[in-house]
């Protein structure tokens, strides 16, 4: 498990959201008054925790998330010739997994990268991971929405059970942060 260095507490998130909501409501006071728009409600850290069970979340890129004029991360574009952000995350996780499993990249028969979405369709993140680590087996990406990690684990289990692989590296490099 690799965890990004940035975290955002409910208090930070709610402070940014409430500032955004107050600004929105002030800028659209006339439309809200006439019923054309609905007022943005304020929130609390307690509500977020009760509704989601989340007290803090990790973010790959914190910049922009708490900016009330943006409210989403600023993830710099990378060219197709550069390692993708998701591949960078996957490599961080892969290196930790290999070390904890006492495995060398040469022992990996397959790399499965499974997530809700990918930043780009080519090259596959699994291929980027293979190239960076020197893995000679096969690899592919799976896009399976919210349950992506469990689908990757199931596919890895099936490969090992069928004898088509002895060692599978399954990675779930999500860029999104819920709530």
Each PLM stretch: what is its role?
Residues 1-107, 133:
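Conserved "HGTGT" condensation-loop signature of ketosynthase/thiolase-family condensing enzymes
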Residues 36-39, 79, 95, 99-106, ...:
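Acyl-thioester C-C bond-transforming condensing/cleaving domain
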Residues 109-116:
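Short glycine-rich or small-residue beta-strand-to-loop segments that form or flank ligand, phosphate
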């Amino acid at each position: 498990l690799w965890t990004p260095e940035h975290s955002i507490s409910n208090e930070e998130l709610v402070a940014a959201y409430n500032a955004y909501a107050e600004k929105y409501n002030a800028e659209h006071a006339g439309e809200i008054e006439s019923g054309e728009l609905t007022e943005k409600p304020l929130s609390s850290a307690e509500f977020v925790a009760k509704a989601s069970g989340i007290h803090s979340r990790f973010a790959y890129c914190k910049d922009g998330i708490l900016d009330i004029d943006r409210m989403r991360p600023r993830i710099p574009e990378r060219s197709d010739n550069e390692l993708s952000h998701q591949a960078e995350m996957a490599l961080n996780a892969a290196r930790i997994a290999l070390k904890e499993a006492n495995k060398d990249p040469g022992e990996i028969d397959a790399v499965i990268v499974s997530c809700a979405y990918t930043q780009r369709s080519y090259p596959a993140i699994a291929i980027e991971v293979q190239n960076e680590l020197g893995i000679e087996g096969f690899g592919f990406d799976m896009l399976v929405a919210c349950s992506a990690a469990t689908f990757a684990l199931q596919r890895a289990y099936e490969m090992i059970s069928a004898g088509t692989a002895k060692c599978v590296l399954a990675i779930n490099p999500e860029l999104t942060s819920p709530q």
